[in-house]
Amino acid sequence: MADEPIELPIDGVLDLHTFDPREIKDLVPNYLAACQARGILSVRIIHGKGIGNLRRTVHAILQKQPAVISFTLDHPQFGGWGATLVQLRPAAV
């Protein structure tokens, strides 16, 4: 049961709390591509605060994505350094 794929809603919010850190290297780029294909160009990735390992991993992944225009930590009122806001390029037609 644990190996069954989980279907995520493609709604511009990706909450990584339930994922193993090893899963996010494929999950984050795939989720961003799905958002981009649907015209969702502002994405919020919730990685939690903790000691920052997951945030650093997410940011390293984002730096390598050609579809990413920019990313920044969320506003303190909405999670601050526990979430990252990502701006994507429109999908090529």
Residue ranges of model-derived segments:
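Long, charged, low-complexity intrinsically disordered regions
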Residues: 1-93
